[in-house]
């Protein structure tokens, strides 16, 4: 009888534990360029975004499938940050077929606007590394950091002359750390989101540099 009672208690405990799953969510603030929501009284220059290629050695090993995911991700980030600067009219060239189809459905002429400049970009450096340390040969604890680094280059090309009229670069580093002390503490696996975070940071820095050039006259788009 005692054995049966113990089994019932254990079963009830197991059910209660399996029923304690929790779900949580929270919104996160998204980093924006420095000029976001700032006043600007100048002319907003029409620009489009051209190619954005991964020129680094990242994801280019013998097992790579040849698809430039890093460059594609970088281009999406660049378009967003350029639009948020309030200094340019960013023209979408990625979805021309869909836009043409919708204009045909609505019966309106597809009247595209031309760009004065094309922005091209390259991921010139990108890398990931793990850094670890031990305290008293690991007895007192150990730590590990995942570090991602990125550097990008932007070139502004005049569509009429093919002249590169201005260039900007940006670089950034992101780190994720965790520490275990005498057997206590969390461990973290490979975090793929660091790639996007550090890429966003580097591109944002390059775009901020571009905006500064417009504001201080180092690059005058309308001349």
UniProtKB/Swiss-Prot annotation:
Q: What is its main location?
A: membrane
Which range is the signal sequence, renumbered to this chain? 1-19
Q: Where in the cell is it found?
A: Cell membrane
The reply on keyword Nucleotide-binding is: no
**Lipid-conjugated positions (N-palmitoyl cysteine):** 20
**Residues covalently joined to lipid (S-diacylglycerol cysteine):** 20
Question: Which PROSITE patterns does the entry mention?
Answer: PROKAR_LIPOPROTEIN (PS51257)
Q: InterPro entries from the entry?
A: Curli_assmbl/transp-comp_CsgG (IPR005534)
One GO cellular component assignment for this chain's record is: plasma membrane
Q: What Pfam families is this protein classified in?
A: CsgG
| Keywords, in A-Z order | Cell membrane, Lipoprotein, Membrane, Palmitate, Signal
What domain of life is recorded for the organism? Bacteria
The way it spans or sits in the membrane comes to: Lipid-anchor
Question: Other comments?
Answer: Present in outer membrane vesicle formulations which are used as vaccines in human.
- This one is known as Putative lipoprotein NMB1126/NMB1164
Provenance organism: Neisseria meningitidis serogroup B (strain ATCC BAA-335 / MC58)
Source lineage: Bacteria, Pseudomonadati, Pseudomonadota, Betaproteobacteria, Neisseriales
């Amino acid at each position: 009888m005692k054995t049966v009672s113990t089994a019932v208690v254990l079963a009830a405990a197991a059910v209660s534990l399996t029923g304690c799953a929790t779900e949580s969510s929270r919104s996160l603030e998204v980093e924006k360029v420095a000029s976001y929501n700032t006043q600007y009284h100048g002319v907003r220059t029409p620009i489009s975004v051209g190619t954005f290629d991964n020129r680094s050695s990242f994801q280019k090993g013998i097992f790579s499938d040849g698809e430039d995911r890093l460059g594609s991700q970088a281009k999406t980030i660049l378009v967003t940050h350029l639009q948020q600067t309030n200094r340019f009219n960013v023209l979408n060239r990625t979805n021309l077929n869909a836009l043409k189809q919708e204009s045909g459905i609505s019966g309106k002429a597809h009247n595209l606007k031309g760009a004065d400049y094309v922005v091209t970009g390259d991921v010139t450096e990108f890398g990931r590394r793990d850094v670890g340390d031990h305290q008293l040969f690991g007895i007192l604890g150990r730590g590990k950091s995942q570090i991602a680094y990125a550097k990008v280059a932007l070139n502004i090309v005049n569509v009429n002359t093919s002249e590169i009229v201005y260039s900007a670069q940006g670089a950034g580093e992101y780190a994720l750390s965790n520490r275990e002390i005498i057997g206590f503490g969390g461990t973290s696996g490979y975090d793929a989101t660091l790639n996007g975070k550090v890429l966003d940071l580097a591109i944002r820095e390059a775009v901020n540099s571009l905006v500064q050039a417009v504001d201080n006259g180092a690059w005058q788009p309308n001349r």
